Structures are given as structure tokens and as C-alpha cells.
Amino acid sequence: MVSVNIEAKKIVDRMIEGADDLKISVDKLENGSTVIDCGVNVDGSIKAGELYTAVCLGGLADVGISIPGDLSERFALPSVKIKTDFPAISTLGAQKAGWSVSVGDFFALGSGPARALALKPAETYEEIGYQDEADIAVLTLEADKLPGEDVTDKIAEECDVSPENVYVLVAPTSSLVGSIQISGRVVENGTYKMLEALHFDVNKVKYAAGIAPIAPVDPDSLKAMGKTNDAVLFGGRTYYYIESEEGDDIKSLAENLPSSASEGYGKPFYDVFKEADYDFYKIDKGMFAPAEVVINDLRTGEVFRAGFVNEELLMKSFGL
């Protein structure tokens, strides 16, 4: 079976080789681990954001940046495009922010292929029937500071690899790379909701594509988190090819999949998060979904469309 860590490492090698042009920095820790700063103490770049997103997806998706003219009638917004032939593995087996990395006073949300070694969380890998067995671990961290050896030692231990085979990429939410990679979760938001909220077998999703605008960079981490989530909730558009079985209600799946189908829909995410006392667990899981969904049922040939791009709320969130 394909290894998300080995595929991601190929992209990491490109980033290390082109670090100067990508405006990122590469540090080798004393334990041999490699830490790649993509926005903490460096500027990062659009290309770095594109590659970072591809690493998050375990190297099993094509990632691009474009400026489509049809999202807003008033102006064009730079957007992230995703397409994958391995939707369950690339989005839930790699990209999902499913590892809370906590060592001493360091805390970060971990995404990327190393999760498939540490099985974070185990239930996800049971659902998709996947586990990586590589001897290298590649993890991306959404954090405002860089990890030390104690953190990479912990990652190595959890992944059962040597510290010198650990590669960690770091980007704050309030950075350009951070903004790009969160919009790059547009397809994953849909597969996540299918599995976690709608309890649909995501292994039936055979191919997927999506696009979402890149939120403006905001130095305030909480406001940045709000804007980046809104980019997908109000501006993300996705297309899923599903091989259904007799009895699957794909029409209902499509109708319940967009963010607008959730109870908490209707306000910028920052306002919702604030009302929830900044507690993610108080927020309806169904809100974390793309704005618009199209599903092609490969068994029947039917196509279902639901949801819509909410330009008004998107512009309000972005301050435009």
C-alpha cells in the first residue's frame, strides 16, 4: 500500500533544497530531527504554502494556487485548488488535524502523514483501513513557536522511528503559509463531516476535488483562525465521486454535507467561537464543511448539488 510519509518526504526534500527561494528556514536539531520553519521566524511564500499543503496531504494530492474570477462578482480572490485520487487516505489519513502534540509548555495541532504511524486518532485509521509502516515521519504543526528536541523525541517515540528520521514543518495560523494550508483543507472538511457527523463510509469516495479562497493574513491568531475557517465554510466548493451501494441515500448525503446545513450556520466563525467561550467542543461538528458540494454517484450516474457560496458572510469575515 502507498506510504504517505515516503510520498510526503519527496516534497520535503524539494523544500529543503529550495529553502532560500521559498523564504523558509531549515534547522537540524542535536538529536538529528529536522525542523522547517514556514512562518514563525520567516516570511514563507505562496509556493511554500502550496508545498506545505501537499505535505499535509501525504503527497497524494495535486495542489495549486489560482485566481478564479467567478467566486465574487466584485473582485477575484486567490484560491487553493485540490484534487486527489486517494480522498480517504490523503485527507483523513494524513491532512486531518488529529494529533494534539503537547510536551511541557509546547502545544500544537499536528497534521500530516506521521499521524498514520502514530495512529492519531486510532478510530480514524480503523474506519479507513489504513496504517503506514514507513521508517520516516513527516508532521506539520500549526504553532506560533518552533518545537525543540523534547517535542521531536516524543514524535519519534509515538511513530516508532529514529529522531533523525523525523521531519517537522511549522506554520502559524497567522502566516501566509498557515492561511493557504487551511484553505487547502476544503476537500478534507467534507470527508471529515461525512465520517464524523454523517457516519458515511468514506472509502466509497473514490476521487475528489475542491477549491477555496485564501483568507487575508491577520497577525491576531484568533481572528486569523476565524477568517481561515470562513474561507472554507462560506467560500469552499467541492466535488466528490462516490461509488455508492444499494440503499445509500446519496441525495440526502449531499443535502446534509454543506456548512449551511449545520445548526450554527449564519455568523463568521470568530463570532461563533467567541460565543462558545473559545471551546471547539461546544461547536456543532457539522459546521466544519465546505460551502458548496457536488456529488457524482458513480453507480447510478446521478449528480447532486447542495449548498452555496455565501459572498456576503465571506466578505464580512475578510473585512471587504
Swiss-Prot record:
Its main location: cytoplasm. It is found in: Cytoplasm. Gene3D superfamilies: Methenyltetrahydromethanopterin Cyclohydrolase, Chain A, domain 1 (3.10.340.11), Methenyltetrahydromethanopterin Cyclohydrolase, Chain A, domain 2 (3.30.1030.10). Keywords: Cytoplasm, Hydrolase, Methanogenesis, One-carbon metabolism. The keyword Transferase does not apply. Disulfide bonds: none annotated. GO terms for cellular component: cytoplasm. GO terms for molecular function: coenzyme F420-dependent N5,N10-methenyltetrahydromethanopterin reductase activity; methenyltetrahydromethanopterin cyclohydrolase activity. Its EC number is 3.5.4.27. InterPro entries: METHMP_CycHdrlase. The keyword Cytoplasm applies. GO terms for biological process: methanogenesis, from carbon dioxide; one-carbon metabolic process. It catalyses: 5,10-methenyl-5,6,7,8-tetrahydromethanopterin + H2O = N(5)-formyl-5,6,7,8-tetrahydromethanopterin + H(+). It holds the Pfam family MCH. Pathway: One-carbon metabolism; methanogenesis from CO(2); 5,10-methenyl-5,6,7,8-tetrahydromethanopterin from CO(2): step 3/3. Homodimer. Belongs to the MCH family. Catalyzes the reversible interconversion of 5-formyl-H(4)MPT to methenyl-H(4)MPT(+). This is Methenyltetrahydromethanopterin cyclohydrolase.
